[in-house]
């Protein structure tokens, strides 16, 4: 699980052998949320409100690079 960024204590990670939709794992202490890279919504999990806003803003600003990373680490998933 490469963590590709740490922002204000939030680890932004992309896993290999993961599942669709393309997403990142945002981890902050005991909290973890999966954020859809395209839709910018939480698929599952939870983060404190202020940390959720920071993580979602990061995903929005880096959407294309995150999609590329997701598909590189998950070559068996067809790009949509």
Can you say where each PLM-predicted feature lies in the sequence?
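Generic secretory/membrane-interface signal
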Residues: 2, 17, 30, 56, ...
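C-terminal structural segments of small proteins and small subunits
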Residues: 53-80
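A short, structured beta-strand/loop element
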Residues: 15-47
